[in-house]
UniProtKB/Swiss-Prot annotation:
The protein's name in its UniProt record: ATP synthase subunit a
Function, in words: Key component of the proton channel; it plays a direct role in the translocation of protons across the membrane.
Family statement: Belongs to the ATPase A chain family.
Main location group: membrane
Superkingdom of origin: Bacteria
Cysteine pairings via disulfide bonds: none
């Protein structure tokens, strides 16, 4: 059993878990704009405003931070923040040079943006599960708030679909529309009679890229968040004994998932630039 902040209302463990895994919603109804409970039957046209707020906010923070560091960069002894930024930039640049075999000045900045942005969104998972939602409830009257954008499939799928659009765009740009069509219809079996089979296989392969990207990131972060929530349901001594080791291990997951998303994006775009 779990209790609310004022200890006057007891809720079940399933209620507690469901509450922490529910997004703050906004939707349009006949009466105007509605929020949360009123959006239960709104269907597809429901905005997860907490995911939007934190993902956009962290993106702006990333841009502002790197811009400020770039302005104050010195050729002398760099500070800790400048060292971190330089390490990120040089590391991603090296990965792009090793993995991307085409010529495109966009890929390295794109890879850096994806890595840092996804990392920052993942990093929100280390904030205690009750801290921000409880503060928002008490100060703003917000009943639901999920602060980890990458535990929302809408966010991870949106990122992956953006990568998918770039894959198709550069495939057509480099190979031409006829070359892209030929790639979908004449591989892996180079015979006109097998064009339908080739088209099905290649289309499934192409569509599987954004789906696998989004589900991998979402699944790992959602599972990690769920474990933190389950730990929060335990007695205080068990919370302390389990939350610290899990948080330390989860740091690896946070970094690794950001790296994998970036790395696969670079590889997919490299494949799109290969003109057979």
């Amino acid at each position: 059993m779990a209790t609310t902040g004022d200890d006057t209302l007891t809720i079940t463990a399933s209620d507690y878990i469901q509450h922490h895994l529910t997004n703050a919603k906004m939707c349009s109804t006949d009466g105007g704009i509605a929020f949360n409970y009123a959006c239960q039957d709104a269907g597809f046209w429901t905005w997860h405003i907490d995911s939007l707020l934190f993902s956009v906010g962290l993106g702006v923070l990333f841009l502002w931070l790197f811009y400020k560091v770039g302005q104050k960069a010195t050729i002398g002894v760099p500070g800790k923040l400048q060292c971190f930024v330089e390490m990120c930039v040089e590391g991603v640049d090296k990965i792009v040079k090793d993995s991307f075999h085409g010529k495109n000045a966009v890929i390295a900045p794109l890879g850096l943006t994806i890595f840092v942005w996804v990392f920052l969104m993942n990093l929100m998972d280390l904030i205690p599960v009750d801290f921000v939602p409880e503060a928002a409830k008490r100060l703003l009257g917000v009943p639901y708030l999920k602060i980890v954008p990458t535990t929302d499939l809408n966010v991870t799928l949106g990122l992956a679909l953006s990568v998918f659009v770039l894959i198709v765009f550069y495939s057509i740009k480099v190979k031409g529309f006829s070359g892209f069509t030929k790639e979908l219809t004449m591989q892996p079996f180079n015979h006109w009679a097998l064009i339908p089979i080739n088209f099905v296989l290649e289309t499934v392969t192409l569509i599987a890229k954004p789906i696998s990207l989004s589900l991998r990131l979402f699944g790992n972060l959602y599972a990690g968040e769920l474990i933190f929530i389950l730990i929060a349901l335990m007695p205080w001594w068990a919370q302390f004994a389990l939350s610290v080791p899990w948080a330390i291990f989860h740091i690896l997951v946070i970094v690794l998932q950001a790296f994998i998303f970036m790395m696969l994006t670079i590889v997919y775009l490299s494949m799109a630039h290969e003109d057979h």
